[in-house]
Structures are given as C-alpha cells and as structure tokens.
Amino acid sequence: MSQVNMRDMLKAGVHFGHQTRYWNPKMGKYIFGARNKIHIINLEKTLPMFNDALAFVERLAQGKNKIMFVGTKRSAGKIVAEQAARCGSPYVDHRWLGGMLTNYKTIRASIKRLRDLETQAEDGTFAKLTKKEALMRSRDLEKLDRSLGGIKDMGGLPDALFVIDVDHERIAITEANKLGIPVIGVVDTNSSPEGVDFVIPGNDDAIRAIELYMTSMADAVIRGRNNVAGGTEVYAEEAAAPAAE
C-alpha cells in the first residue's frame, strides 16, 4: 500500500486552515496553533488519518465496490472530474442534486433520459428534427450531462463517498448518513466533522491540496482494482469504528 508522507502534505499546504475567528471548536483537537491569525492544522494527526482513509478506499476497491467522489465548488470540480475519470469512479463535480442518493429511483430515470438523448445525438435523430426541437434537446442533453454525466455509469448506489469540503457538500453527507453509506471527508478548521466516518483534517481550498487528496484517492482505487480479492462486500461496519467524535 502506497502512503502519503508529511513532505507531500507540507508542499501542498494541507496544514493551512482558516482564519482563527471562523474556527469550529469540534476541530480543536486537530489544530496545532495559529500563525498570523490563521489556524495551523496538526499534520502529525492528519497523516495517519489520511493514510487510514486511503487504506479503506483501497480495500473497498479491492472488493469491487464503488467510491463516489464529490467536489462541486469551483476550486475542486475540475480536479474531481479528472481524477475520478482516471480511476473509473463515479463523481459529482457541478452541483449536488437533492435526492441523488435518497431518491435514486428518480435520478435513475433522469440518467435513462440522458442516455436516450446521447443515442439520439449520435444516431442522427437530432438532424431529422426541426431546428427548434433539436436545440431544445441539445440543451436538455447538455444540462443533464453536466449534472449526471459523472454518475451515469454508476449502476446503483455507491459504497462510499469521498468529499472535498464537508460544509459545501453537507446535503450529500446527510443523504449518505441516512443510507448508512460511509463518508470520507476533508474537514477544514471552520467545519464540523459530524457525519464523517473518516475525517481528514486539512485545507479544503488550496488547489495543490485538493490535487493531493484526489490524486491519492484515485491511486488507491486503482491499486485496489489491480489487486482484486474475492469481491467481499466489506467495511461498512469498519467505517463505524473511526467515526468523528
């Protein structure tokens, strides 16, 4: 199993939290101190927690389970889409639609509509329509692809969520909690770790930090899939153990 090291995290700026006045007391135990009114995250705590999360993801992937990557804010979306595509994982990079997990039956119907429109665009159906109707369907296709393109091949609910910025993606976390889906999350000093099974205390804004998290997670998925072992549906119970206090 490949692990992230302290130097990687320092270079990426994982240790830089938010301004001290915005801190969340629930993250106090992960804060080393403050510099220029910015909280500094204790990487000696982050390092083992990050590597535990990577090990969990690798074992999930080894059991042929699906890990959904979620990062919809501007600094995260592009990186999330690129790394999820690299490891063949479902992802949400634009906007979390309410009910994406808890109302998956409706989401699945929208995915079917997306696939139908993709087929029509490819087989020449659009060319046979009036210009107005073709334009309407093209716009519908574009809208659906932006919202659901990352999960159209998921084929069912994911077995875990990896979330960048737990405050920004709180609806996704709440839905996962309701369904008992384990959540791995990057939690900054201004956020609450509640509802997150595998907390990664760290900077959730810096692009280099987000690249480190996403690249490492994608690598863990690839390693797991390259070392498939018997396909056991494991680790939902394991996720309950390290839950945030």
Curated annotation (Swiss-Prot):
InterPro entries: Ribosomal_uS2, Ribosomal_uS2_bac/mit/plastid, Ribosomal_uS2_CS, Ribosomal_uS2_flav_dom_sf. GO terms for biological process: translation. The keyword Cell inner membrane does not apply. Pfam families: Ribosomal_S2. The keyword Electron transport does not apply. Keywords: Ribonucleoprotein, Ribosomal protein. Belongs to the universal ribosomal protein uS2 family. GO terms for cellular component: cytosolic small ribosomal subunit. Gene3D superfamilies: Glucose-6-phosphate isomerase like protein, domain 1, Helix hairpin bin. PROSITE patterns: RIBOSOMAL_S2_1 (PS00962), RIBOSOMAL_S2_2 (PS00963). This is Small ribosomal subunit protein uS2. NCBIfam families: rpsB_bact. GO terms for molecular function: structural constituent of ribosome. CDD domains: RPS2.
